[in-house]
Amino acid sequence: MSNRRVVVTGLGIVSPLGNDLASTWDGIVNGRSGIGPISHFDAGAFATRIAGEVRDFNPADWVPAKDAKKMDSFIHYGVAASLMAIADAGLVIDDGNAERIGALIGSGIGGILGIEEQTEKYLQGGPRKISPFYVPSTIINMLPGQVSLLTGIKGPNFSAVSACATSNHSIGMAMRMIQYGDADVMIAGGAERGSSPTSVGGFCSMKAMSTRNDDPAAASRPWDRERDGFVLGDGAGILVLEELEYAKARGARIYCELAGFGATSDAYHMTAPSENGEGPARCMAMAMRDAKVEPEAIGYLNAHGTSTPLGDLAETLAIKRALGDHAYKTMVSSTKSMTGHLLGAAGGAEAIFSVMALHTGIIPPTINLDEPGEGCDLDYVPNVARQAQVDVAMSNGFGFGGTNGTLVFRRL
């Protein structure tokens, strides 16, 4: 593999905190919660009735109305975030570069809302009521496909699908595509609209989600003694990645370098984290080796931090295992305390927050952390953002099936 370095030049996000980077980042640094009562279906019969919904989003702002009808909501979010990231990068796509620009954008559960809607039409009226756009509107790889159709990019175009590690793997493999020489620019990340009735119902049946329905803003509380499960969130997080010399040649503004990527498997349990965080620890170690950085270099770690009793402790143990004594000197926070858990889009949003931490010198807080739970004894940047200039940031994403993904970003 040639020594092709990869940098981040564009960021785009749709989240429960806002429908662009400025509003979302403002919410993050000010410790605002985007969690509220579920509003787009009647959740009265569900154990969990709260989520981080995307609000005041109009897909027609990003795609023609006639085309928007052919896309599930997760595609709307992903297309919008992709177009924002392209604009933020100042990237002009033309016949001269289109074949060298690709998209690797995934989703954890994809078009589940569309599947529900079309199933209802079938049950009410039979097969003739099923939309001819049902399949292409719900399959996950149609998201990068729509980005290609809208922008004209002709490079590698596909999706990673690995539950809540989807975006970490998408971004990491997009970096590899550039390093391998298969592309000069990749649009990468994930999108999700998971707050649908069957999705919420499924997670409720697993007893995986918080039931703090009377206080939604305080429901997502990673590492806190009173944490009782995660809170679903919707949205998309997309990065524009470029080969360093290509970015320099076109005069691009460079946020930072994407220096390392790790991917491992627990081989332990369908949904529970591995004991003592063994799998995630190997993943972090792999990413650091790839970036050629020592544990002592990690200044900030955007954790997976879902607010589940088992998961938060396991990740704390994994961080200690991977970073050794330096774990206690590393600022660790979970922005899921504010956004909720965006599932397949989580790693994209959190990669953006990691990049912004390097770029702005502001470390995102973990809100709702009033009293750390047993064994949770790291510096979780509780409740208030912190001014701190760091050179290296790490971002974790772990998913059902025991799949892990870690990214390492470095200031240039």
What are these regions (language model features)?
Residues Q124-S131, G172, R176, E192-A249, ...:
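Glycine-/small-residue-rich "gating" segment that lines the acyl/pantetheine channel
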Residues M1-V8, D95-A98, A291-A297, Y328, ...:
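Flexible, low-complexity linker/loop segments at domain and module junctions
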Residues M1-D67, A89, E245-Y255, I352-T366, ...:
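ACP-dependent fatty acid/polyketide chain-elongation machinery
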Residues R5-T9, G36, D214-A291, Y300:
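Condensing-enzyme catalytic core mediating Claisen C-C bond formation in acyl metabolism
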Residues G10, I28, S82, A103, ...:
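Conserved small-residue
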Residues Y268-G277, T306-L323, L342-A349:
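Short glycine/threonine-rich loop-to-helix capping motif typified by GTGT followed
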Residues G78-A89, L143, S170, E242-L244, ...:
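Short, well-ordered amphipathic alpha-helical segments that serve as non-catalytic structural scaffolds
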Residues M1-N3, P37-A80, R100, G110-M173, ...:
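Conserved catalytic cysteine-centered active-site region
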